[in-house]
Swiss-Prot record:
UniProt keywords, alphabetically: Cytoplasm, Lipid A biosynthesis, Lipid biosynthesis, Lipid metabolism, Lyase
SUPFAM superfamilies with a match to the protein in the record: Thioesterase/thiol ester dehydrase-isomerase (SSF54637)
CDD domains the record matches: FabZ
Family: Belongs to the thioester dehydratase family. FabZ subfamily.
Function in brief: Involved in unsaturated fatty acids biosynthesis. Catalyzes the dehydration of short chain beta-hydroxyacyl-ACPs and long chain saturated and unsaturated beta-hydroxyacyl-ACPs.
Catalytic reaction list: a (3R)-hydroxyacyl-[ACP] = a (2E)-enoyl-[ACP] + H2O
Compartmental location: Cytoplasm
A Pfam family assignment: FabA
Gene: fabZ
GO annotation, biological process: fatty acid biosynthetic process; lipid A biosynthetic process
EC number assigned by the record: 4.2.1.59
GO MF entries: (3R)-hydroxyacyl-[acyl-carrier-protein] dehydratase activity
Name assigned to this protein: 3-hydroxyacyl-[acyl-carrier-protein] dehydratase FabZ
Signal sequence, start to end: none
Source species of the chain: Variovorax paradoxus (strain S110)
Amino acid sequence: MTTTTLDIHQILKLLPHRYPFLLVDRVLDMEKGKRITALKNVTMNEPFFNGHFPHRPVMPGVLMLEAMAQAAALLSFHSLDIVPDDNTVYYFAAIDGARFKRPVEPGDQLTLEVEIERMKAGISKFKGRALVGSELACEATLMCAMRQIN
């Protein structure tokens, strides 16, 4: 079993996302064709905290899902031995069973755990969880599609 780690510089070479929408800071381990564990450090400097909510900042649930999808994209690229270029896009195709169990606040470290359930014909299905420490913050089944654009 070989695992892979990625720092932010390697992540920037693989994902097209940039501030304020890059939501993966580090990959702790990644097993080709199986799973990934990644981190998102949540700080008070996140732009979404200005309006969500000023009196009690909470990370929007949809951004937890997006963070899991970005981790899933990294896992897909690694599993398929793909280095994406400007013509490669990775889209959400579906989100099922999304559940939000605890708020994520400034100072929290979000651990993203994503496992491949199925990969076929450019469409992948994943089971994802986002945790703060040992507490489940969010879980969902994600489907993503990789496409080439011109």
